[in-house]
A protein has these predicted regions:
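Amphipathic alpha-helical scaffolding segments comprising HEAT/armadillo-like alpha-solenoid repeats
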Residues: 2-10, 33-45, 66-81, 100-113, ...
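HEAT-repeat alpha-solenoid elements in large eukaryotic scaffold proteins
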Residues: 11-20, 46, 50-58, 122-133
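Alpha-helix N-cap/helix-start positions at coil->helix boundaries
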Residues: 20, 35, 50-54, 85-86, ...
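Alpha-solenoid HEAT/ARM repeat scaffold
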Residues: 21-24, 54, 58, 89-90, ...
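Extended alpha-solenoid helical-repeat scaffolds
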Residues: 27-32, 61, 67, 78, ...
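Residue-level signature of alpha-solenoid helical repeat scaffolds
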Residues: 58, 93, 125-129, 169, ...
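Structural signature of alpha-helical solenoid repeat scaffolds
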Residues: 61, 96, 128-129, 172, ...
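Eukaryotic acidic, Ser/Thr-rich intrinsically disordered low-complexity regions
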Residues: 271, 279-301
Length: 301
């Protein structure tokens, strides 16, 4: 009997059974749960071991990253109130593309009051979605500014460095001048992680004002900074970056993440010379994953 035909009650039993690995083929059964199935799962949830719950949600998140059809929103919503911090953080990540602005008050409360730094960091990240929606005027203006104010307060406040960095990245969508000042301050720091966060925010801003800074950072000694600058160059469609990015392809970048980012950013910037280089690179590719990325980049031109 296939997982699709298995009664959901048996799926729940399999999840609760610590003596056997939960079958990966059953993960998709948690997508778009029917109300009755969700109620049954939530009734059993407190009796399922914490490790099994964490593993399930982590596996669902991994599936979500590669499968654009599945949605675990219905499961994740009630788990935002789970007593386990890892479960709460994973629930936020599962809701990473859910545009329901009714979630915002919960996220703001978690950002400010949750005892777990991981949860606060996840909340800071997911609020970036609503910064983007706010700039597009797709959520109420008052709610958008409430998110903006909260994130600015976090960046300026005394929370952990990681949470402040995630908040700055989410603020990248904001057009408020105060945010631009925060980005400039972060970029002026010695810490390369702060600089990378600033560049990430610049890429999200869509503002030409950051082009010179991004171009300068393409040659940075730190891979994390180069990676962020390369991505920002693509997001901002900086034509002047094209020769340097093409040279990176020619010379071969040792860092795989940086090399892949160069390919994608060039696909965003475009140009016939980019098509020629990527086509040649595809012909030489021996790695299937790299070849798939290049094909996707060519399609994006």
């Amino acid at each position: 009997m296939s997982p699709k035909q298995t009664p959901f009650s048996e799926i729940i039993q399999a999840l609760a059974d610590e003596n056997r690995p939960f079958p990966a083929a059953s993960l998709r059964r948690f997508s778009d749960l029917e109300p009755a199935d969700l109620r049954s799962l939530l009734d059993e949830w407190p009796r399922i071991k914490t490790g099994r719950k964490r593993k399930l949600l982590a596996d669902l998140w991994s599936l979500l990253e590669v499968d654009t059809v599945v949605s675990f929103d219905e499961l994740a919503r009630p788990l935002l109130k789970d007593p386990d911090a890892q479960v709460r953080a994973l629930a936020i990540r599962l809701l990473g593309e859910c545009e329901d602005h009714k979630l915002v008050p919960t996220y703001l409360d978690m950002l400010i009051r949750d005892e777990s730094a991981d949860v606060r960091a996840a909340a800071a990240t997911v609020l970036g979605l609503f910064m983007d929606l706010g700039e597009l005027e797709e959520i109420p203006a008052a709610l958008y500014h409430k998110v903006e104010d909260a994130l600015i307060a976090v960046v300026k406040g005394g929370d952990t460095v990681e949470i402040r960095q995630r908040a700055l990245e989410s603020l990248g969508y904001s057009s408020r001048e105060e945010v631009a000042e925060l980005i400039e301050q972060a970029c002026a720091r010695i810490d390369p992680v702060w600089v990378a966060c600033a560049l990430f925010a610049m890429g999200r801003s869509g503002l030409e004002r950051w082009s010179d800074e991004v171009l300068t950072r393409l040659n940075d000694d730190h891979a994390i900074v180069r990676l962020a600058a390369i991505k920002a160059a693509g997001e901002l469609d900086i034509k002047e970056a094209r020769p340097l990015l093409l040279r990176m392809l020619e010379e071969g970048e040792n860092d795989a993440d940086v090399f892949e980012a160069v390919i994608w950013s060039l696909s965003q910037i475009g140009g016939e010379d980019v098509r020629i280089y990527l086509t040649e690179l595809l012909d030489q590719a021996e790695d299937d994953e790299l070849a798939a990325l290049i094909e996707e980049a060519l399609a994006n031109l």
